[in-house]
């Protein structure tokens, strides 16, 4: 039986370079991915290198709050 809160939690990953570029100029959008993480194995914020269709390259996507 599981104790306390659920171990697996759904998180949203957002492109960090799109967020920085949207401040300077008009952006076409911000790339976001939805995934799950195990709270016991990775208690800190998740950062993964994923493909951003707006930047046309692989960039770092960081976890954001819901």
From Swiss-Prot:
The keyword Cytoplasm does not apply. Coiled coil: none annotated. GO terms for cellular component: chloroplast; ribonucleoprotein complex; ribosome. It is found in: Plastid, Chloroplast. The keyword Plastid applies. It holds the Pfam family Ribosomal_L33. One of its GO terms (molecular function) is structural constituent of ribosome. One of its GO terms (biological process) is translation. Keywords: Chloroplast, Plastid, Ribonucleoprotein, Ribosomal protein. It comes from the Eukaryota. Belongs to the bacterial ribosomal protein bL33 family. This is Large ribosomal subunit protein bL33c. The gene is rpl33.
């Amino acid at each position: 039986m599981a104790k306390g809160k659920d171990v697996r939690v759904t998180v949203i990953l957002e492109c960090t370079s799109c967020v920085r570029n949207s401040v300077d100029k008009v952006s076409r959008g911000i790339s976001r991915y939805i995934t799950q993480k195990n709270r016991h194995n990775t208690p800190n914020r998740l950062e993964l290198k994923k493909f951003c269709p707006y930047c046309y390259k692989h960039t770092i996507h960081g976890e954001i709050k819901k």
